[in-house]
Amino acid sequence: TAQREQALLLLADQQRRWGHLQEVILQPWRPDGEAARQLSEPEQSDLLNTIVMARQLLPAQVHLQTPPNLWPLDQLPAALEAGINDLGGIDTVDVINPAYPQPAPETLRQLLAPLGWRLEPRTCVHRQWWPLLPAALRQRVEQCARLLASAPA
């Protein structure tokens, strides 16, 4: 829609101006209290179009995230092909959408590996942004990243 395009253009402008936009989360909107339900095909199509638009309008260093628990798993590859490059915190409870359980990381690995995608743990700050962190915080984030890298898959 025109409103989404305008919002994405504003975000792109802010990124070019200030350079501090780490990610944009693209997910279906659900009213508070609505029972859990699968995305309809029109909702999926609308969200995929928004992802494509976001990837075209936002600078490449801005990650696009979608929570995999809000997609039908068999349609998640389409979101990745459209431009998603971050699945967020998949190993935790979704505190924003608690009615939607997170898929197991192994389930996601099995789905994505044959398509050439790799599931990788990361800190809440993307690596490209570490140089902007204060030294003490950067050291802590690097320590957390080493722990994540050494954890069993």
Over which residues does each language-model region extend?
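Auxiliary Fe-S-binding modules of radical SAM enzymes
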Residues: 2-153
